[in-house]
Amino acid sequence: MTTPAYKRVLLKLSGEALMGDDPYGINRATIERMVADVSEVAKLGVELAIVIGGGNIFRGVAPGAQGMDRATADYMGMLATVMNSLALADAMRQVGITARVMSAIAIEQVVEPYVRPKALQYLEEGKIVIFAAGTGNPFFTTDTAAALRGSEIGAEIVLKATKVDGVYSADPNKDPDATRYATITFDEAISKHLQVMDATAFALCRDQKLPIKVFSIVKPGALKRVVMGEDEGTLVHV
């Protein structure tokens, strides 16, 4: 068997990815398929941490939050990520994968608090760590949480799972001539105004020299191919 390209990775999942074809919430078939993909990577011996969004349940910047205090709306979004994290961990448990949910906000009866040395210990033991509640602060996205946690745990790369199979020169849904970049530098992405992550998350990854791989979570086997270092998605690097 070929050796994986990475030993420790941070996977960023959007909450919307859990919806499947449903208008909101968690689609069971979709989460089971995601867990199967994660299981394939875990079997390779790759240490895997996950940050998940909450947009399938609530978004602090969504129309439903209009008129609401932004900080309050963001806290509600953090709670949504805890719900998603619990669902993901439970789906993993049912197929024999040991996962630990660690929250940036204290909900100790439900999940344990995020403590960096403990998270590192879990990863070294071969457990999957799911980081919930974003950064624990309002006004920061879960993309920023992914960049932050990835930096903290010494991940070699942030894997940003999306609905498109990489970064394109233009919106592929609108422009038939849009081309996918196999690799692109952080500075090139900025100069071309390409939306990879929000500005705070992107700047943190660039400053920490933490590469980002953008790939499609809906494409079968894509996660494993990314971890094996194959030509899948777009690599954003220094």
Swiss-Prot record:
CDD domains: AAK_UMPK-PyrH-Ec
GO cellular component: cytosol
Subcellular location: Cytoplasm
Record keywords: ATP-binding, Cytoplasm, Kinase, Nucleotide-binding, Pyrimidine biosynthesis, Transferase
Binding site for UMP: 54, 74, 135-142
Regulation: Inhibited by UTP.
Broad class of enzyme this protein falls into: transferase
Family annotation (InterPro entries): AceGlu_kinase-like_sf, Asp/Glu/Uridylate_kinase, Uridylate_kinase, Uridylate_kinase_bac
Chain residues that bind ATP: 12-15, 55, 59, 162, 168, 171
UniProt pathway annotation: Pyrimidine metabolism; CTP biosynthesis via de novo pathway; UDP from UMP (UMPK route): step 1/1
Entry's EC annotation: 2.7.4.22
GO molecular function, one term: ATP binding
GO biological process, one term: 'de novo' CTP biosynthetic process
UniProt catalytic activity: UMP + ATP = UDP + ADP
Domain of life: Bacteria
A Pfam family of this chain: AA_kinase
Quaternary structure (record): Homohexamer.
Annotated HAMAP family: PyrH_B
Protein purpose: Catalyzes the reversible phosphorylation of UMP to UDP.
Family to which this protein belongs: Belongs to the UMP kinase family.
Protein name according to UniProt: Uridylate kinase
Species assigned in the record: Janthinobacterium sp. (strain Marseille) (Minibacterium massiliensis)
Upper taxonomic lineage: Bacteria, Pseudomonadati, Pseudomonadota, Betaproteobacteria, Burkholderiales
UniProt gene name: pyrH
